[in-house]
């Protein structure tokens, strides 16, 4: 309609074929975990380790402060719970100070507890692009569910139990399966 009235014109660059969208997903559970902190505005900081393949919450908690110690503590929890199957191979995080030291020496090295912990356990640390929350979108989407549904449950643990055992929309399985 707009073209017939002279308000728009064809743009050949927009007609070019675009790359097909590829679903980003690991094949096996425990191959990668998405980690992030969230401030829901209730005085607590929420931190979770979300499995990339199944979307299951492997560990999580509501804390007073978002710290590198708390970040390390939950990855340790994942290793102690699931290490008999496999130690998580990669973590995907943003550049938050809980995960990454922004001040580095000329060789790119820094003294940071969380980074040192990952190195000691041979876990690869994948950093998302700056100001690009889509890179860690699976955990960002989980925070939306947290905001909507958390108030229905008396404890964080009950909320996680509900989340991990509800049917997964695209897999026709529960996250725990």
Where are the language model's segments positioned?
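Charged, gly/pro-enriched flexible loop segments at helix/strand junctions
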Residues: 153-177
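RNase H-like DDE/DDD metal-dependent nuclease/strand-transfer catalytic core used by mobile genetic elements
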Residues: 8, 37-46, 54-158, 162
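Basic, flexible linker segments flanking DNA-binding modules
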Residues: 1-34, 109-112
């Amino acid at each position: 309609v707009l073209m017939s009235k002279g308000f728009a014109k064809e743009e050949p660059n927009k007609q070019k074929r675009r790359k097909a969208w590829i679903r980003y997903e690991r094949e096996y559970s425990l191959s990668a975990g998405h980690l992030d902190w969230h401030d829901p505005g209730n005085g607590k900081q929420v931190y979770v380790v979300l499995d990339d393949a199944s979307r299951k919450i492997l560990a999580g908690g509501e804390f007073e402060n978002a710290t590198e110690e708390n970040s390390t503590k939950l990855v340790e929890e994942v290793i102690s719970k699931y290490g008999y199957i496999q130690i998580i191979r990669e973590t995907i995080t943003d550049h938050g100070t809980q995960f990454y030291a922004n001040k580095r020496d000329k060789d790119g090295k820094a003294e940071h507890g969380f980074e040192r912990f990952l190195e000691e356990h041979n876990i690869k640390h994948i950093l998302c692009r700056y100001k690009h929350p889509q890179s860690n979108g699976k955990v960002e989407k989980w925070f939306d569910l947290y905001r909507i549904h958390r108030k229905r449950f008396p404890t964080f643990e009950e909320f996680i139990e509900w989340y991990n055992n509800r049917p997964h929309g695209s897999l026709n399985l529960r996250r725990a399966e």
